[in-house]
């Protein structure tokens, strides 16, 4: 129920009669850009051999041969693959290492 108050201009304003009180705070977990992981993306290029890309994934990122080949095939067939993810500093370091090895690597935030 609302109380009505008439102003000097004849306008009726309403306001709540009682304000409900919250006994406990409600916490909402909102996904913000600060807590989303970063991803290292390797892009297909016309320069590097498939065997070399697989080799780089093994030596630079530490993947076994099977996983390195799966990621290399994803790059080859889909044009790109997310090859690592995590905190920004770690992914940034992975991107730099892959670029030094001659691969086309970028980073982006998940989401």
From Swiss-Prot:
Disulfide bonds: none
InterPro entries, alphabetized: ClpS, ClpS_core, Ribosomal_bL12_C/ClpS-like
GO biological process: protein catabolic process; proteolysis
Domain of life according to the entry: Bacteria
Pfam family, one: ClpS
Subunit and partners: Binds to the N-terminal domain of the chaperone ClpA.
Cited HAMAP family: ClpS (MF_00302)
Family according to the record: Belongs to the ClpS family.
Functional description taken from the UniProt entry: Involved in the modulation of the specificity of the ClpAP-mediated ATP-dependent protein degradation.
Protein name: ATP-dependent Clp protease adapter protein ClpS
Gene: clpS
């Amino acid at each position: 129920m609302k109380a009505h108050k008439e102003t000097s201009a004849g306008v009726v304003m309403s306001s709540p009669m009682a304000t409900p009180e919250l006994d406990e705070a409600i916490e909402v977990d909102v996904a913000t850009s600060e807590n989303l992981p970063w991803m290292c993306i390797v892009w297909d290029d016309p320069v590097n051999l498939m065997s070399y890309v697989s080799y780089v994934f093994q030596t630079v990122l530490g993947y076994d041969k099977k996983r390195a080949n799966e990621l290399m095939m994803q790059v080859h067939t889909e044009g790109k693959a997310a090859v690592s993810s995590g905190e920004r500093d770690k992914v940034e370091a992975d991107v730099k290492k892959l670029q030094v090895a001659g691969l086309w690597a970028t980073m982006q935030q998940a989401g």
